[in-house]
Amino acid sequence: MSLLELFCHVDDFWQQFSWFWEAELLKSGLKQRRRAGKLYPSEIMTLLIYFHQMRYRDFKTYYTQYVQVYLTDEFPHLVSYNRFVELILSVLVPLCAYLRSCYGDCTGISFIDSTPLAVCHNRRIPQHRTFAGIAQRGKNSVSWFFGFKLHLVVNDRGELLALG
């Protein structure tokens, strides 16, 4: 999928989802500024999804060496890398809803697979604090790991059905 097609798809989703999301947000009773940012949420979501389609290993290199250099025509109001990282949290819920909207339909034939998401090396388990109490030791076909296990269910067309 090209960047333009991806943006159109995400922006169409955002146009429908934003009304629902605004209605469901809790009101604090205090007056709050509702000033629009430089980047629309659909642009932030597009850049995050497009990162996974590119062959960059880390997000900082992708944003500073690709987005800020080659995508300035497509996204004229880009923010700095540090500000973009702060904005990611604001689109987490819409991004999860977008993922859920992209799920396929069950066709009768489904495949399930799992992959480990290691959070640290096995030697560092006693010093690990980020996911302390949440992450656990696990085993896959290759070795032991400390972290989480991601399970994916796909149909025979390669469409995502569920994850856990």
Language-model regions, residue ranges each:
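Short alpha-helical elements
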Residues: M1-G164
